[in-house]
């Protein structure tokens, strides 16, 4: 991480970039958040570790409107999203200085919790340069351990590859983390009867609280005016009156991003209800392939 910080300082100092788009520590040790850094001094708060799962491509839509270049840190999977945004003329390539950062798979705190690990105070082994295959977790109940691969986000188990598709320079090495078939879960759903499919999606979508996190984080949801914010009909409201509205929001959103979704998995990562929203988009992908 220090190499990345040093390079960012150099690019700020010589005027190549006006700001850096990366991550800073959040309120919890496993919750870093996207952040801008405009001075060398501010980079003391920069972090990059296994919990930096956020895809920063979408932030470049607004950054492209600012004066000067923005240094943006992109993981291999993020570069697919950035390329798609270039095709749609939503980001300005000339306003971006892309550093392709190494990735050994990003971590999902919920997968750690599902192993019965609670009361987390700190986690070691998540550093990007750390080759450790085990996370050491300090909790209020004592020290716990967890295999790194068992704590990875679902999208990392079906990784599209460790190569960056667009960059100005690379810092850090990436690891091939794929150990599962990308469409296995979709094929399981495809094998269900119509009644079983309906029951599956009904059970998942009934958990939705319409927080709009999936839409807000999605690089493919880049319309200047979203249909769901329209005041001409009731879709702008947060609460769902009935199950039809629950389905309408997600099905329409899936149709809107069909053919442009890069399967970055951000929708599922940020969902506070744990809904596997990426399965909708993968269903469209497998349908197009057939």
Per-region residue spans from a language model:
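Residue-level marker for well-ordered alpha-helical positions
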Residues: 5-6, 202, 212, 255
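A generic structural-conservation signal
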Residues: 21, 95, 217-218, 270
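Active-site-adjacent beta-strand anchor residues
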Residues: 72-75, 208, 270
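A generic "binding-loop/recognition-motif" signal
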Residues: 78, 214, 267
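Hydrophobic, aromatic-lined core segments that form the binding pocket/scaffold
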Residues: 151, 210, 215-217, 221
């Amino acid at each position: 991480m220090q190499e990345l910080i040093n390079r960012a300082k150099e690019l700020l100092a010589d005027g190549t970039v006006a700001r850096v788009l990366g991550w800073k520590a959040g309120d919890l040790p496993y919750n870093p958040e996207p952040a801008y850094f405009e001075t060398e001094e501010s980079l003391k708060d920069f972090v990059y570790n296994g919990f930096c799962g956020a895809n920063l491509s979408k932030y470049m839509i607004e950054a492209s409107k600012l004066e000067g270049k923005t240094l943006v840190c992109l993981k291999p999977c993020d570069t697919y999203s950035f390329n798609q945004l270039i095709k749609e003329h939503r980001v300005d390539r000339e306003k971006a200085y892309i550093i392709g950062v190494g990735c050994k798979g990003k971590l999902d705190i919920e997968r750690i919790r599902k192993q019965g690990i609670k009361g987390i105070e700190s986690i070691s082994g998540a550093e990007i340069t750390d080759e450790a295959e085990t996370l050491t977790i300090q909790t209020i109940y004592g020290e716990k351990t967890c295999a790194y691969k068992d704590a990875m986000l679902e999208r990392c188990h079906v990784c599209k590859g460790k190569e960056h598709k667009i960059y100005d320079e690379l810092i850090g090495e990436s690891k091939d983390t794929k150990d599962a078939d990308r469409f296995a879960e979709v094929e399981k759903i495809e094998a269900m009867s119509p009644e079983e499919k309906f029951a599956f999606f009904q059970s998942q979508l009934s958990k939705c609280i319409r927080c709009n996190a999936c839409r807000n984080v999605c690089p493919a949801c880049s319309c200047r005016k979203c249909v769901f914010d329209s005041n001409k009909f009731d879709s702008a409201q947060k609460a769902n009156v009935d199950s039809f509205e629950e389905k309408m929001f997600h099905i329409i959103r899936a149709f809107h991003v069909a053919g442009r979704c890069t399967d970055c998995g951000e929708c599922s990562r940020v969902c506070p209800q744990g809904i596997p929203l990426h399965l909708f988009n993968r269903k469209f992908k497998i349908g197009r392939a057939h």
